[in-house]
Amino acid sequence: LGDSHHIDEGTHAYIRYNRVRVPRDAMLGQPGEGFKVAQARLGGGRVHHAMRTVGKCQRALDMMVERANSRRTQGKLLAEHQFVQGMIADSYIELEQYRLLVLKTAWAIDEVEAGRSPPVAPRTLIAMCKVQMAKVYHDIIQRAIHLHGSLGVTLELPLADWWGGVASLALADAPTEVHKIQVAKSLLKRGTIAPGLFPGEHIPTRMENLG
């Protein structure tokens, strides 16, 4: 690849086991339960990813606001262009929505640690954080890059480097699609079944039952 290319700190290593034997007294847990142990830690790791995403998106939004208040095009500040105002508003709204989801998820985990909720309670929230993570990150970083023009795609700003992490966020700790399935299954499991031929909100049936 040449001297101009390098492997950065975000690269994951390949590990290959060849006839590895583990002494019985060195085993953690029971045979076949390694995935369960890993899953116990992945939940917190996913929330950690989410928190870092909130922080980077906040930095990107701050950069957008600074750029809009400083850069002039066509005789006026970027901040005076309504399209730019819309980009900033959309980014702030999406960030605050995601921030609240992450905070609620962290609160749910604390409730489990305090013994006030069952261990499975935060799972759906964690999956929701993972699903939205890459989308919110993608949309806000993309707007920030566009607002900075050609400078946004250079390594003179952190935006291009952040942009390169969008795909990995959607894949790390299981792809987005897997977490969507988990969210849907959770809702379907708790859902109801129509009491008869028509849906539960069927107005004529409800009026008839009111008598």
What are these model-predicted stretches?
Residues L1-Q58, D62, E66, K76, ...:
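FAD-binding core of flavoproteins
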